Design a protein with these regions (language model features):
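Histidine-anchored nucleotide/phosphate-binding helix
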Residues: 32-36, 131-141
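Active-site acidic carboxylates
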Residues: 1-90, 111-114, 156, 161-169, ...
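Short leucine-rich amphipathic alpha-helical surface patches
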Residues: 126, 141, 150-153
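Residue-level detector of anion-binding/catalytic polar loops
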Residues: 143-145, 173
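Active-site catalytic pocket residues across diverse enzymes, especially alpha/beta-hydrolases
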Residues: 85, 105, 109, 140-141
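Conserved N-terminal glycine/acidic-rich loop preference
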Residues: 90-132, 155-175
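Short acidic/polar active-site loop segments enriched in Thr and Asp
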Residues: 41, 117, 144
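Short internal beta-strands
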Residues: 44-47, 145-152
Length: 175
């Protein structure tokens, strides 16, 4: 059995920065504990990555809160999460979901029967980047078991954590 952990956007701006929430702060210990249950070669992380022109982008026009500008403190992964990740692969993504991540998972599982493959997803924000990546991965790897650990996720607002129901409807297991 090959099991991969994907840690989505555990960045300072989403935890205690410009888009931070108490719920995001509350999951940091759970996220670190989860990372520590995996070997580092089975852990991937994403980093929301924007440029200085963020407010002129479609996302910036719809969410006019500057965040995760490449190279800033807010863009960096939480220091404790980064330490737990060790040498895990971290990929920048310019949008909510990452096709590059899905392609990497296809390569990770190449030659293995789908029933011997599993992906677990944790991180921020449940209702934007977690759900986007989960659905891209499910579309790209429809027979691979994909799960989300709700105790290691937080939404933009407590009620938007309801994105977990959307994922369940798309055959993503929520724990």
């Amino acid at each position: 059995m090959k099991k991969i952990l994907i840690v989505v956007d555990m960045q300072n701006d989403f935890i205690d920065g410009s888009l931070g929430t108490p719920e995001a702060e509350a999951i940091v210990d759970n996220v670190i504990a989860k990372i520590n249950t995996y070997t580092k070669d089975c852990v991937y992380a994403t980093r929301d990555t924007h440029q200085d022109n963020y407010l002129q982008t479609q996302e910036g026009e719809n969410l006019p809160i500057v965040h995760c500008i490449e190279g800033t403190y807010g863009w960096q992964l939480n220091e404790r999460v980064q330490a737990a990740l060790g040498g895990a692969v971290v990929m920048n993504k310019p949008s909510f979901g990452s096709w590059e991540l899905a392609d990497m998972m296809v390569m990770e599982f190449a030659g293995l029967p789908a029933e011997e493959c599993e992906i677990e997803i944790i991180g921020l924000c449940t209702d934007i980047c977690v759900v986007s990546n989960a659905l891209i991965l499910k579309a790209r790897l429809p027979e691979v078991k994909i799960s989300v650990d709700a105790s290691c996720c937080a939404g933009v607002r407590p009620e938007s954590h309801a994105a977990l129901q959307t994922m369940q409807m798309c055959q993503i297991h929520v724990r």
